[in-house]
Amino acid sequence: MREAMQLVPMVVEQSSRGERSFDIYSRLLRERIIFLNGEVNDAVSALVCAQLLFLEAESPKKPIQLYINSPGGVVTSGFAMYDTMRYIRAPVHTLCMGTARSMGSFLLMAGEAGERTALPNASILVHQPSGGFQGQASDMLIHAEEIRRTKHRMTRLYAEHCGRTYEEFERAMDRDRFMTAEEALEWGLIDRIITEREIGAERDA
């Protein structure tokens, strides 16, 4: 992630006040576009949540575009972003470019109903949460119970957002389940597959 940030290009704009330069992500933020690129962790979650809150404060009804290319990561960090997406008034439109795995797919399906999209060659993965821990047997049992509760919560939310039954997603998440964009559409994780930027998205941005 650090190496990627070092390669971020700068955009130079001319105005009556002179010349200003922005990194490309800051420039896209002005168009209400947020990138979730890379692993989901506390630092990335804090950044995305802050951008969501900032854009809502600027315009509480104007859509926000969340572009996702993520292998997933920390469950609690993902839940923080999920809850913030639901908390703000501005609708969040999600788009998968590349891959949305684990918590990446969870955030993809959490977008505004009817506005969850993927590019044609996107790859989506759903699976149950996992965790590794050491310690006394009693502590391990406590952690195992917490993972069980987290799995139940995630399965319920997947089912609610995707219009499927709890049992269907429980079976789907029992093992790693990779999906093409077409399969994700069939499962209700996304609402449509797009091949080029839509006119409405350009107008909203």
Curated annotation (Swiss-Prot):
Cellular localization per UniProt: Cytoplasm
Q: Which Gene3D superfamilies match?
A: 2-enoyl-CoA Hydratase, Chain A, domain 1
Q: Name one Pfam family in it.
A: CLP_protease
**Gene Ontology biological process terms, A to Z:** protein quality control for misfolded or incompletely synthesized proteins
What is the enzyme's class at the highest EC level?
hydrolase
The record's GO molecular-function terms, alphabetically, read: ATP-dependent peptidase activity; ATPase binding; serine-type endopeptidase activity
Principal location = cytoplasm
Enzyme Commission no? 3.4.21.92
User: Which reaction does this chain catalyze?
Assistant: Hydrolysis of proteins to small peptides in the presence of ATP and magnesium. alpha-casein is the usual test substrate. In the absence of ATP, only oligopeptides shorter than five residues are hydrolyzed (such as succinyl-Leu-Tyr-|-NHMec, and Leu-Tyr-Leu-|-Tyr-Trp, in which cleavage of the -Tyr-|-Leu- and -Tyr-|-Trp bonds also occurs)
Query: What task does this protein carry out?
Result: Cleaves peptides in various proteins in a process that requires ATP hydrolysis. Has a chymotrypsin-like activity. Plays a major role in the degradation of misfolded proteins.
Q: Kindly state the subunit structure of this protein.
A: Fourteen ClpP subunits assemble into 2 heptameric rings which stack back to back to give a disk-like structure with a central cavity, resembling the structure of eukaryotic proteasomes.
Q: Which PANTHER family match?
A: ATP-DEPENDENT CLP PROTEASE PROTEOLYTIC SUBUNIT
Q: What is the protein name stated in its UniProt record?
A: ATP-dependent Clp protease proteolytic subunit 1
The organism named in the record is Rhizobium meliloti (strain 1021) (Ensifer meliloti)
